[in-house]
Curated annotation (Swiss-Prot):
The gene is glpK. This is Glycerol kinase. The keyword Transferase applies. ATP binds at T17, T18, S19, T265, G308, Q312, G409. Key enzyme in the regulation of glycerol uptake and metabolism. Catalyzes the phosphorylation of glycerol to yield sn-glycerol 3-phosphate. The lineage of its organism: Bacteria, Pseudomonadati, Pseudomonadota, Gammaproteobacteria, Pseudomonadales. Sn-glycerol 3-phosphate binds at T17, R87, E88, Y139, D243. Keywords: ATP-binding, Glycerol metabolism, Kinase, Nucleotide-binding, Transferase. NCBIfam families: glycerol_kin, PRK00047.1.
């Protein structure tokens, strides 16, 4: 480890759903340089989404080379690589040629819906929830992998003979970067496959049997922070975490009760529950996160379907704003929403309601309502939905929320951040560093190779740019929230369907 002093940089590879990025960090965890390339999305049928794994690897290697060149660095100056990735996306490749036998099936792809329905008919929902922490949904890797083995001729037999390998995107990239020497994944990615027992920390024999998946094709599961292998040019690969778990670590949410919300198109909330794998009563996922040194910790995860997309709707469909950034100005022009609530259930409601038949609605309209009130109500809806999820997580875990760390595009909106603190009655902390996902991967790699000595050293680098303190009186806060709950109840079960009462 002696030469680590001469290596002053860490590279984070952030392999996302639409682009591959490389971000170089220095010893102070500042961004030195970033490179990014988009790649093609393939939609062979309605509801199907695929990526070309070779293109993912090509763009990911290209941006790494590009970032080094841009920063004027040689690979000898890099201490380690950390990888963070779009989760659940499924790749199967030939061990000898290193080529995929089918395109990657992406997390958004719904083609394995029928396989999930069969699992439900077979009464496996409770077993899946207990063992893997997940709901029975095409979102997760297991049913995607079964689909490939069912539909690519001879593939199951070849997998049994040890000729084919399965991996999520992290595994695929590491296999390619190490020239086929290393077939691994980490606990956070394994916990998204629906094939992994999150309590024993082993591949689950019953799930493999039910989905008819040969054990031979699965990667070895390791911690999120250790040296897994080296690239052909000799750089150590030292950190792996799925994107949401990497963001949780990048935000330094390593103690029970610490939570982060990523405000994107939807919102992704994760709350650390320490060494307790909490079974949710509210439809949250129980998932594996990173403990203080990349070891296994548990978290609850909940998703809000419509966050930033609600603001896009104001802009693109209603055309009442020109730019998402304008919402802060309009929301601040009025003292409140004038009794208006917008429930953005455009695609149903996610956690904790799980109602696919709910539809969006505006409530409380009177003649005094102006566009400003509607814009304000749209921003408020993002904060209300976040509270819905965090209240459920606190009930499930028995942990009190200490503070909410935030990242993602919408955190630049000061009105939204202040209202979020107000409606939660909890401090909201916005970090200076917005690249929290890549930072998490860099931290994990840096800890593995001794680039950074300890968690305490990293905590010193987590600069909070602004803290938003709650300013609403308790009675006012609860009055507003009661109005939201009433509005949500009126949107439920709107769309006609077979199971309707």
């Amino acid at each position: 480890m002696t030469d680590i002093q001469n290596k002053n940089y860490i590279i984070a590879l952030d392999q996302g759903t639409t682009s591959s990025r490389a971000i170089i960090f220095d010893r102070d965890a500042n961004v030195v340089c970033t490179a990014q390339r988009e790649f093609a999305q393939h939609y062979p049928q309605a509801g199907w989404v695929e990526h070309d794994p070779m293109e993912i690897f090509a763009t990911q290697s290209a941006v790494m080379v590009e970032a080094l060149a841009q920063a004027g660095l040689h690979h000898d100056q890099v201490a380690a690589i950390g990888i963070t990735n779009q989760r659940e996306t499924t790749v199967v490749w030939d061990k000898n040629t290193g080529r995929p036998i089918y395109n990657a099936i992406v997390w958004q792809c719904r083609r394995s819906t029928e396989i999930c329905q069969q699992l439900k008919r077979d009464g496996l929902e409770d077993y899946i929830r207990e063992t893997t922490g997940l709901v029975t949904d095409p979102y997760f890797s297991g049913t995607k992998l079964k689909w490939i083995l069912d539909n690519v001729e001879g593939s199951r037999e070849r997998a049994r003979n040890g000729e084919l390998l399965f991996g999520t995107i992290d595994s695929w990239l590491i296999w390619k970067f190490t020239g086929g020497k290393t077939h691994v994944t980490d606990y956070t990615n394994a916990s998204r496959t629906m094939l992994f027992n999150i309590h024993t920390l082993e591949w689950d024999a019953k799930m493999l049997e039910v989905l008819d998946i040969p054990r031979e094709m699965l990667p070895e599961v390791k911690s999120s922070s250790e040296i897994y292998g080296r690239t052909k040019s000799g750089i150590a690969i030292g950190g792996i975490a799925g994107d949401q778990q990497a963001a949780l670590f990048g935000q330094m949410c390593v103690e029970p009760g610490q939570a982060k919300n990523t405000y994107g198109t939807g919102c992704f909330l994760l709350m650390n529950t320490g060494d307790k794998a909490v079974k949710s009563q509210h439809g949250m996922l129980t998932t594996i996160a990173c403990g203080p040194s990349g070891e296994v910790a548990y978290a609850l995860e909940g998703a809000v379907f419509n966050g930033g997309s609600t603001v896009q709707w104001l802009r693109d469909e209603l055309k009442i704003i020109n730019d998402a950034h304008d919402t802060e100005y309009f929301a601040g022009k009025v003292k409140d929403s004038n009794g208006v609530y917008l429930v953005p259930a455009f695609t149903g409601l996610g956690a904790p309601y799980w109602d696919p038949y709910a539809r969006g609605a505006l409530f409380g309209l009177t003649r005094g309502v102006r566009v400003d009130h509607i814009i304000r109500a749209a921003l408020e809806s993002i904060a209300y939905q976040t509270r819905d999820v965090l209240d459920a997580m606190q009930q499930d875990s028995g942990e009190r929320l200490k503070a909410l760390r935030v990242d993602g595009g919408a955190v630049a909106n000061n009105f939204l951040m202040q209202f979020q603190a107000d409606i939660l009655g909890t401090q909201v902390e916005r970090p200076q560093m917005r690249e929290t996902t890549a930072l998490g991967a860099a931290y994990l790699a840096g800890l593995a190779c001794g680039f950074w000595g300890s968690l305490e050293e990293l905590r010193g680098k987590a600069v909070i740019e602004r803290e938003f303190e709650p300013q609403l009186a308790e009675a006012e806060k609860e009055g507003l929230y009661a109005g939201w709950k009433k509005a949500v109840s009126r949107t439920r079960d709107w769309e006609p369907h077979d199971e309707a009462k």
